[in-house]
Amino acid sequence: MKPGKRVPLARPNRINKEIRVTEVRLTGIEGEQIGIVSIAVALQKAEEAGVDLVEISPNADPPVCRVMDYGKFLYEKSKSIKDQKKKQRVIQVKEVKFRPGTDEGDYQVKLRSLTRFLEEGDKAKITLRFRGREMAHQQIGMAMLERIRRDLCESENSIALVESFPARIEGRQISMVLAPKKKQ
């Protein structure tokens, strides 16, 4: 086969003359049950309506067929699949690093980015790293995490819930994870 040539995909549903059974359970255009009829009658009804006869459930006994516009059916199906994909969203964990000596301006900038992450629906991991003699002043780091928690979770317009708050320090850093609040 030549490169660049596509093989036409087989249709997921058989339509019109592709249906090779003697009788089918027929459903009308509006979804109303017509009953069990021969394939010739079903094809005639589809032709009278100016649409296709589509085999919906080939494994049923007798197979279920519906009188409908096949092109419109495929379009609506692809549209619903696109809508489902649009609604799916992978939640990421975004990390923001602080130090015990983070000044007010930097603190506000990092707080804004934390707010943005949470409003976008992502989780936020706050890591507070200690260097050198900062290890002797761990209470400053805990106070900073407490302040972040107050600003994002306990204010009147809180946007986050604490998922994990550190009870103690692991090595040279403390971590806290915040999850976005569910919107009502």
From Swiss-Prot:
<comment type="similarity">
    <text>Belongs to the IF-3 family.</text>
</comment>
<comment type="function">
    <text>IF-3 binds to the 30S ribosomal subunit and shifts the equilibrium between 70S ribosomes and their 50S and 30S subunits in favor of the free subunits, thus enhancing the availability of 30S subunits on which protein synthesis initiation begins.</text>
</comment>
<dbReference type="GO" id="GO:0032790">
    <property type="term" value="P:ribosome disassembly"/>
</dbReference>
<dbReference type="InterPro" id="IPR036787">
    <property type="entry name" value="T_IF-3_N_sf"/>
</dbReference>
<dbReference type="Pfam" id="PF05198">
    <property type="entry name" value="IF3_N"/>
</dbReference>
<dbReference type="InterPro" id="IPR036788">
    <property type="entry name" value="T_IF-3_C_sf"/>
</dbReference>
<dbReference type="InterPro" id="IPR001288">
    <property type="entry name" value="Translation_initiation_fac_3"/>
</dbReference>
<dbReference type="InterPro" id="IPR019815">
    <property type="entry name" value="Translation_initiation_fac_3_C"/>
</dbReference>
<dbReference type="GO" id="GO:0003743">
    <property type="term" value="F:translation initiation factor activity"/>
</dbReference>
<comment type="subunit">
    <text>Monomer.</text>
</comment>
<protein>
    <recommendedName>
        <fullName>Translation initiation factor IF-3</fullName>
    </recommendedName>
</protein>
<keyword id="KW-0963">Cytoplasm</keyword>
<dbReference type="InterPro" id="IPR019814">
    <property type="entry name" value="Translation_initiation_fac_3_N"/>
</dbReference>
<dbReference type="InterPro" id="IPR019813">
    <property type="entry name" value="Translation_initiation_fac3_CS"/>
</dbReference>
<dbReference type="GO" id="GO:0016020">
    <property type="term" value="C:membrane"/>
</dbReference>
<dbReference type="GO" id="GO:0043022">
    <property type="term" value="F:ribosome binding"/>
</dbReference>
<dbReference type="GO" id="GO:0005829">
    <property type="term" value="C:cytosol"/>
</dbReference>
<keyword id="KW-0648">Protein biosynthesis</keyword>
<dbReference type="Pfam" id="PF00707">
    <property type="entry name" value="IF3_C"/>
</dbReference>
<keyword id="KW-0396">Initiation factor</keyword>
